[in-house]
């Protein structure tokens, strides 16, 4: 007869114990304890046997008691901003996945603004919860002089002014922005305009500074950038402004959403992309594949940034040593699609 198999009882007839799990899995009770505690120094096949035995017996370890015994709740605190934005959401997904694989849970706080005071409040709240480590996904331009992270808690950060002061994992913004500008210059465009990201974003500032520096290296004075805020609406507004200038033939947008908004504005005002205006975005979001035309962009691996930050935190947890100022730069990749083309001479 079908149906869900009922959990077995332990030898004494009561709830199953660690010894019952060990007996069924053919391992020691110490191994069962290591698996239930999330330890990583257990062979994959052994872990699988123990987990199957737990499931078959209906065994559930007392997490609170385990935490009290070892002085750790196996929890990573995460501070993020704009979780509704695709990039931050993907990075947070990477954090969650890596933490889960390592046997850790996540306690997350989303701040409304990346101001130092908001960040400080969130960090202190998580530290008081007794988290084993902290991951700061987005701190914007929060000043390291005014935002001091707890010295006794392992920390990793990404894409903020805190990079260089704490262990970090971030996309190589400089190489990515240079690749975007070089691509447009290589197509013969004599000037590359720029739609920025918000001024409280460290990654946006790096992309803008790299754009300007690369143009100057090529003997070109950068035109006045157009302020954006990551949204498609800001890109659309920038596109309306730039479309009115017939001299504009190339635009580097600080992110994909703004680039897609700009492309629509160009089309609506009779400027064809890429025949009249070439457009490059940044991020490599999947929606760029389905824009019209498909968007040339700089792809960054958001999920890997989250995974690397967890790895940096757990290395500090395992070693008991601070991570110093170690920086992991994650490579970016120029993805050439249909929104860029060689510059056409005006007739």
Segments from the language model and where they lie:
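Hinge/beta->alpha junction and helix N-cap segments in small-molecule ligand-binding domains
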Residues: 63, 81-90, 108-117, 169-179, ...
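Alpha-helical recognition/docking segments in bacterial nutrient-uptake
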Residues: 1-4, 13, 75-182, 186
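Short beta-strand segments enriched in small/hydrophobic residues
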Residues: 31-34, 68-84, 90, 183, ...
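Periplasmic-binding protein-like
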Residues: 128-138, 193-195, 225-226, 246-255, ...
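Short acidic/polar active-site loop segments enriched in Thr and Asp
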Residues: 28, 74, 132, 189-191, ...
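N-terminal helix-turn-helix DNA-binding module of bacterial transcription factors
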Residues: 1-74, 344
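Flexible loop/turn connectors
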Residues: 11, 245-347
